[in-house]
């Protein structure tokens, strides 16, 4: 009889523990953070899971930004979307127009969490804010601006001041020639050429990229990056390329690897590349602001953000959304947002995270770590330098890559390439405009 009682009690306890295990709400989080960045994403998720045993954030690397966005949309159509999808900034208009999302402000409201949207840096939050409601549609996460990384040891060898990176594109062209003369095979390379050499070149020099304030004022915007200033800039890079001073090594982050391997003396890349550079560079390096065009009056203006935000997908259970809200709230806590900023090089997305980082003395100990923030806040943004909100922008970036590659291979002049990119890109904008009105 006692044995039967023990058996029954053991069975009851087993079922109870099984019930507790089954009660854990699993929350898939698809992202594009690899290398050191991916490790930090995993670390944040693990700490949240330990503090919130009823929920389990499961980060899944789904490839680069384009691949992750495509995978997320395809999964939504089949009813298998993750709860959280990281989408890069140029996918914002696409996500806004889709019926696949649940706005983050609604997620917090439904979860009963009093979430202060004003804590986010305004120039970052504005990129992801709905103009009609004034609320965030997605939560800023890994926001960045392009910065200039340079090899201080190579500078010394070339007779250049290692504490003075080039401030203008004209200076950069001069520096690359000297670096090459001193033995560097690659003086300068650039990743993400559309984002850096056209989108941010335009904003940093106070030029529009598209009409309608870069699309923020309507879907009937047209591209405008084939103006004399942009053409002149691409012509400068073309001339450097012909001399061997500028090396085109790929559309994404390939130039960062070329830099930290010591092959290229300088590169313009995301501030978020700092984590990998810090890990792999075996030489002294520095961080400088993006160069500006010395011939453009009023430059530099302000940088526009890159990186990505976190979107919440439709069609999930209430308990899943509660867990998502708690996780997003966790990410925005000053200590967590500050740690993410310090370990990765991405911008501090909240004012409190920036202040905490400053109080901790991080910027004093790590000169250049605040470059991305200083660029973004260099001057109050003009209506057409606060960012981009253009439909089909990922595909437009591909077009820009194709056309710029035709310049580097000598098949087109800078004017021909940018004219064609604008023409092809405008066709995609008209398709998006038509679809958004249907």
Curated annotation (Swiss-Prot):
Signal sequence residues: 1-23
Family annotation (InterPro entries): Bact_solute-bd_prot1 (IPR050490), SBP (IPR006059), SBP_1_CS (IPR006061)
PROSITE patterns noted in UniProt: SBP_BACTERIAL_1
Chain sites annotated for binding sn-glycerol 3-phosphate: 65, 89, 144, 270, 307, 346, 397
Intracellular or extracellular location(s): Periplasm
GO BP terms: transmembrane transport
GO cellular component, one term: outer membrane-bounded periplasmic space
Pfam families per the UniProt record, alphabetical: SBP_bac_8
Domain of life, source organism: Bacteria
Keywords: Periplasm, Signal, Transport
UniProt KW Chloroplast keyword: no
CDD domains in the record: PBP2_UgpB
UniProt subunit comment: The complex is composed of two ATP-binding proteins (UgpC), two transmembrane proteins (UgpA and UgpE) and a solute-binding protein (UgpB).
NCBIfam families in the record: PRK10974.1
UniProt family annotation: Belongs to the bacterial solute-binding protein 1 family.
Function according to Swiss-Prot or TrEMBL: Part of the ABC transporter complex UgpBAEC involved in sn-glycerol-3-phosphate (G3P) import. Binds G3P.
Protein name, UniProt field: sn-glycerol-3-phosphate-binding periplasmic protein UgpB
